[in-house]
């Protein structure tokens, strides 16, 4: 096990072999580089123009998609949302889908102007809905991972245990060691592989000068009303595929039916068994196959 000092100096791409193993991929690892566009940081995968854009959930970062992207084998852009990962924080702590999409639109035009698909999970999915409504040229097709515009209502209905790692966003922010952060995360997601959780915490944390560790993401201090995004769904021209975690309560059958009713081009829903909210972390191989199936229909 690496010490805190060794973790501090570890390159962010040093663990990609673990992602390849998790994805069941043999052979050389794909090209990947960190790119910056103003206040937004992202990971650009592959040696050609990105075909897929990935937007993560609240309290996550672009590396949450590493295993899926390695397994998919397509050129991609995984974005750190505002206030997350290596992207800049907002002074007002407002990371609503509406503001996120306004920030991301020019970035995506610069870094992935010809992308065909957007895969968005949780807050990233809601951001993608708003983005598709305001800039339809940027979202040719949309895959939503365990989210609809009823997300805040569902979040309020769940217990802390049911929220899993999402509950960590509202807890302690500073820890005396990396292991203390990892222990808390393991307790929140006991069903998940410890090696995967350790990798996730590594990407989602940073060490302070005093030796303590903190989460990389800002505290979301202002919550907007997501329900208005249902009107955006009404206006979307992009086809939509919904992926649900079979053990997650963040999307209900009622929400699925509402999405089906409102979306002009609803391709269908995939329920991933033995998965909670973060399907890309709980069952990455299943998500790889679903996304590949969507790509193959183009």
Curated annotation (Swiss-Prot):
Active-site residues, Swiss-Prot/TrEMBL: 122 (nucleophile), 146, 277
Give the GO molecular function terms.
Answer: carboxylesterase activity; hydrolase activity
Q: Could you say what the effect of mutating residue 155 to A is?
A: No change in sensitivity to Zn(2+)
At which residues is there a site annotated Involved in substrate selectivity?
58, 155
Q: Which residues cross the membrane?
A: none
- Summarize the temperature dependence annotation: Optimum temperature is 39 degrees Celsius for the hydrolysis of p-nitrophenyl hexanoate.
Protein name as it appears in the record: Esterase Rv0045c
Source organism = Mycobacterium tuberculosis (strain ATCC 25618 / H37Rv)
Q: Lineage, please? A: Bacteria, Bacillati, Actinomycetota, Actinomycetes, Mycobacteriales
